[in-house]
From Swiss-Prot:
Keyword Nucleus: yes
Name this polypeptide is given: Nuclear cap-binding protein subunit 2
SMART domains referenced in this protein's UniProt entry, alphabetically: RRM
Family matches, as InterPro entries: NCBP2, NCBP2_RRM, Nucleotide-bd_a/b_plait_sf, RBD_domain_sf, RRM_dom
Function field: Component of the cap-binding complex (CBC), which binds co-transcriptionally to the 5' cap of pre-mRNAs and is involved in various processes such as pre-mRNA splicing and RNA-mediated gene silencing (RNAi). The CBC complex is involved in miRNA-mediated RNA interference via its interaction with Ars2 and is required for primary microRNAs (miRNAs) processing. Also involved in innate immunity via the short interfering RNAs (siRNAs) processing machinery by restricting the viral RNA production.
Biased composition (Basic and acidic residues): 9-23
Residue span of region Disordered: 1-23
Oligomer status and interactors: Component of the nuclear cap-binding complex (CBC), a heterodimer composed of Cbp80 and Cbp20 that interacts with m7GpppG-capped RNA. Interacts with Ars2.
Sequence intervals crossing the membrane: none
Residues reported in the UniProt entry to bind mRNA: Y10, Y33, R102, V103, D104, W105, D106, R113, Q114, Y115, G116, R117, Q123, V124
One Gene Ontology CC term in the entry: presynaptic cytosol
Coarse class of the protein's main subcellular location: nucleus
Naturally occurring in which organism (per UniProt): Drosophila grimshawi (Hawaiian fruit fly)
């Protein structure tokens, strides 16, 4: 493998199985995790970009667990490993909706993984952000809750 398609150090802590089973699943996978998406990026935009590398089998958009709205990630599954490797080489680090997107291997989509794992329903990384990011809903969700005006007092 070349460096651009090697496995990263990230491992899904919720993977059901041993570390060696996870490694094997990642090495054989045709599924990619795509991160740092804008909350406004559409499935059609993702399909247009990733289909340049091969036939996309399915795209699963990441959703806020409670609101069921996009929360900045998705899974893209190809029919072959070679197509997925091409996407790792050519799409990782490119711009989509004016954001540098991250592409990484995923062991394979399982129902339920499309939901954010943060306390507020989105991604954990968006809970604690202190910077303002218009493409990811403004300030971090926990910070936004602290600074939101109290509308109960009339």
């Amino acid at each position: 493998m070349t460096a651009s398609v090697d496995l990263s150090s990230y491992r899904d802590q919720h993977f059901k199985g041993s570390r060696s089973e996870q490694e094997r699943s990642l090495r054989d996978s045709t599924t990619l995790y795509v991160g740092n998406l804008s909350f406004y990026t559409t499935e059609e935009q993702i399909h247009e970009l990733f289909s340049r590398c091969g036939d996309v089998r399915i795209i699963v958009m990441g959703l806020d667990k409670y609101k069921k709205t996009p929360c900045g990630f998705c899974f893209v599954e190809y029919y072959t490993r070679a197509e997925a490797e091409a996407a790792m080489r050519f799409v990782n680090g490119t711009r989509l909706d004016d954001r540098l997107i991250r592409v990484d291997w995923d062991a394979g989509f399982i129902e339920g993984r499309q939901y954010g794992r943060g306390k507020t329903g989105g991604q954990v990384r968006d809970e604690y952000r202190t910077d303002y990011d218009a493409g990811r809903g403004g300030y971090g969700k926990l910070l936004s809750q602290k600074i939101a005006p109290n509308t109960d007092n009339r």
